[in-house]
């Protein structure tokens, strides 16, 4: 190997695109045509982008071909303040998963999934990813998941978890995730707030060259969620019984602690409940034997 090739890349220019052939050049020329302006350099484009914020970001939207079911009535309010944060692309409606999956060619590699072990590295094409996401989204719909429902994950950054996330986005549900190194109390603190109807997880986690059982923490998490839901159900029933037997008590209506308790119970009565747990088994090689696990 030549000496130059063995030198670290940090601080060295490894490639320079030809002048006039960069994607940014084509974008700048497009803005010049569509807005009848003269922007000869990148610096000119930057100045225009901060003086014509709405026009610039509309041009970016068009350039990257965002797919939307409803277009924005306004990109951003003129002279929008830094605080409170401005609302962007007002009225636009789009699906994140659709935009992620649409643009890649079928045979292009969409995901390179790696673990600590090189032999576990796998590549997934856009065609394969679309198929997996479609199947997972169909399964979520069959489980009754609708836009606005919450789907959670208690797993690692795996291909299966990515597919679950994109499927969740495809059906319009809310996604939240917790890293597998979280203990039960930390997971419960998060999930009792967001109330998932479906929980994705795994049976094992590979860390520092060893496989660690994950089912123990998962089962404890499920038990904790169900216990909280059972208590809330009992509270709701007790509240409903008291509400039915009580007369219209003006004192109760003006009693702030009672009003807060009543509001909490009414929220609990309508909150979503954990209904399904989906486990994606660890599919890498065993560190000890290089053999795939059964099941």
Locate predicted features:
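Conserved AMP-binding/adenylate-forming core of the ANL superfamily
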Residues: 43-48, 97, 111-166, 183-188
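A short N-terminal helical cap/helix-turn-helix that marks the beginning
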Residues: 50, 58-72, 90-112
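Structural core segment of the AMP-binding/adenylate-forming
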Residues: 170-295
């Amino acid at each position: 190997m030549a000496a130059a090739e063995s030198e670290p890349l940090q601080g060295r220019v490894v490639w320079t695109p030809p002048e006039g052939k960069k994607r940014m050049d084509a974008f700048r020329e497009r803005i010049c045509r569509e807005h009848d302006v003269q922007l000869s350099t990148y610096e000119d484009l930057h100045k225009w982008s901060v003086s014509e914020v709405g026009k610039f970001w509309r041009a970016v939207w068009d350039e990257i071909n965002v797919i939307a079911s409803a277009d924005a009535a306004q990109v951003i309010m003129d002279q929008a303040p830094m605080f409170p944060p401005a609302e962007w692309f007002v009225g636009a409606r789009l699906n994140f998963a659709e935009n992620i999956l649409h643009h890649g060619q079928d045979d292009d590699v969409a995901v390179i999934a790696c673990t600590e072990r090189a032999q576990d590295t796998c590549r997934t094409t856009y065609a394969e990813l679309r198929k997996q996401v479609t199947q997972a989204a169909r399964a979520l719909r069959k489980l009754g998941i609708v836009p606005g429902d919450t789907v959670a994950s208690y797993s690692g950054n795996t291909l299966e978890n990515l597919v679950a996330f994109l499927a969740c986005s495809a059906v319009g549900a809310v996604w939240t995730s917790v890293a597998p190194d979280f203990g039960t109390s930390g997971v419960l603190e998060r999930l009792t707030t967001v109330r998932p109807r479906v929980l994705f997880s795994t049976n094992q986690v590979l860390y520092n060259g060893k496989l660690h059982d994950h089912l123990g923490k998962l089962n404890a998490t499920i038990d904790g969620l169900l216990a909280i839901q059972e208590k809330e159900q009992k509270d709701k029933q007790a509240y409903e019984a008291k509400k039915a037997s009580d007369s219209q008590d003006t004192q109760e209506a003006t009693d702030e602690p009672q009003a807060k308790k009543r509001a909490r119970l009414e929220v609990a009565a309508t909150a979503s409940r954990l209904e399904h747990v989906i486990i994606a088994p660890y599919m890498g090689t065993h560190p000890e034997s290089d053999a795939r696990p059964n099941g």
